[in-house]
């Protein structure tokens, strides 16, 4: 089982060789993931891309080997081994299958808003199941008219009593259709260009998937358009201040 056992930070030192050295634990991890990738992921790469189907078996494989826990601290069931080891893992998987590497990349990106800006309750509620690989997230920012410009987005969130009501759609979202929840950026005050960040579970009424993109490559990682039609979420699903979501988007 992968767990932090040393300082994995790479700091500035007196020599260039030391500055770019990699800890032995990271080398061991690299070799372990390289073996898994070459022996079990690479043989599936062609079929994954040819079928354009999400590789659930690879996600299970990564979870069973603690690889999906790399982005997370130990208190949430992760490895606590830091960004260096995460990026080494992504690199090794991508060498065998780019689609499969995005499983780990999105596990990191989709939970980053919660890890950086979420409440303790939100972290406890959403992070352990992602660290174990039981659930997978998606980060929903880009829109057809706005691209990835948070200030121009048209998806809205309106407060109605104790709930927020989300309306709109997103484009080019990695993990669309397979994610268990979306971190959705939505306008809370269009006139003043205020936005918020909201955790929207995929099984909530009003959540659907519109278009799935037909891509030239990396076809096993779905890219699509989640649609939110009068989707109601509790106040507890707001990440931080509902009018300061721009800092969340830019921080990620």
Where are these regions (language model features)?
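A short core secondary-structure module
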Residues: 163, 167-209
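A short, Trp-centered hydrophobic/proline-enriched beta-strand micro-motif
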Residues: 133-141
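Internal helix-loop-helix
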Residues: 64-134, 174-181
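Glycine-rich beta->alpha junctions and the first turn(s) of the following alpha-helix
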Residues: 7, 17-22, 29, 95, ...
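Hydrophobic, small-residue-rich alpha-helical packing segments that form membrane-like cores
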Residues: 147-149, 164
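Long, well-ordered alpha-helical segments
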Residues: 33-40, 118-125, 161-167, 197-207, ...
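A structural signal for short hydrophobic beta-strand segments in well-ordered beta-sheet cores
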Residues: 155-158
């Amino acid at each position: 089982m992968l767990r932090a056992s040393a300082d994995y930070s790479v700091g500035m030192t007196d020599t260039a060789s030391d500055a770019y050295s990699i800890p032995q634990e990271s080398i061991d991890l690299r070799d372990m993931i390289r073996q898994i990738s070459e022996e079990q992921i690479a043989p599936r790469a062609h079929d994954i891309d040819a079928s354009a189907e999400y590789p659930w078996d690879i996600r299970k494989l990564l979870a069973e080997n603690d690889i999906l826990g790399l982005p997370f601290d130990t208190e949430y069931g992760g490895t606590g081994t830091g960004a260096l080891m995460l990026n080494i893992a992504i690199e090794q998987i991508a060498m065998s299958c780019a689609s499969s590497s995005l499983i780990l990349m999105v596990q990191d990106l989709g939970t980053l808003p919660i890890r950086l800006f979420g409440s303790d309750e939100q972290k406890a509620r959403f992070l352990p199941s992602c660290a174990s690989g039981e659930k997978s997230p998606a980060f929903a920012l880009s829109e057809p008219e706005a691209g990835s410009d948070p200030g121009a987005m048209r998806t809205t969130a309106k407060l109605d009593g104790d709930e927020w009501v989300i309306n709109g759609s997103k484009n080019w979202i990695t993990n669309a259709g397979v994610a268990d929840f979306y971190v959705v950026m939505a306008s809370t005050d269009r006139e003043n260009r205020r936005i918020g960040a909201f955790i929207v579970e995929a099984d909530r009424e009003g959540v659907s998937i519109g278009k799935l993109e037909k891509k030239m490559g990396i076809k096993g990682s779905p890219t699509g358009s989640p649609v939110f039609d009068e989707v109601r979420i509790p106040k507890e699903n707001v990440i931080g201040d509902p009018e300061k979501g721009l800092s969340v988007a830019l921080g990620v």
